[in-house]
């Protein structure tokens, strides 16, 4: 049944305002989220079934990076002595936090099939295999030593704000089961390694929420990743033509400037696009010729004037569009919204919270929508 949500009280309005930012969170579907939010989360969440790799001979690890060695010694509670290949070859998920004030998270020996990419606290089987380890470390700059982690499927690297970029990704080439990779800024000289990561399905690149800290000067190596379907980039100015050959299903951009969206027309399988908290964009026109079905253009209050001079007409010309969030787009008007609803029979989920069109919500024909959210400014 169609749901119509309006500003009935201050608490509800506050919750809806927070929903403008919720799409930037990696949250699983749950009982406290709307159907529209659940749909978005389902489209942007990668399941990583646990598996175990075959191991070769055992040997003493000769460490290349002392910071990585410090992390592993802390995990093993082994401040001195040799560390063997067999000590690390069953690690399936690793979160390394350096200088962030948060402990590392390690998952090993998870039963085959358990989703190790999910939220540990909400999965008993996963939680039983997870360990959090506190420690104080310098930022990680090399991932070369991860070549010894045969079973690694999920890897998150988080360095403190302002840390130097990672200089070496070569160890990841040997992680043949790696599916989900999240890394902060990487030096340009290390980017070619991305093209060799054939098993990675989801890549989160850049310091989370800190655009200026991420090197995005040349992303062409990402377009050569054979299995890559889901890409989230945080950075400054991004040239999408460098990604034109990528076979992406999901593209999420938290960047300062994109410029042209023309490259989207060459991504025939791209179904979800998130423009997170506003970017400088030349025109929305290429969206009309894209394959995008799920489009998030929600803005925070601080960024609500980002698209004030843009023409939203191309959004009314997207025949495959199913899901659209325009929260805080302060120049999306009633006339354009009426065109959108009249022309797009595929559209099922629409959020126009805090837009001019929301003031005239009663005039809009939303009968075909599954969910319509429109608290007025």
How would you name each of these model-derived features?
Residues 18-20:
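C-terminal motif of bacterial Sec signal peptides marking the signal peptidase cleavage site
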Residues 44-82:
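Surface-exposed cap/linker segments adjacent to membranes
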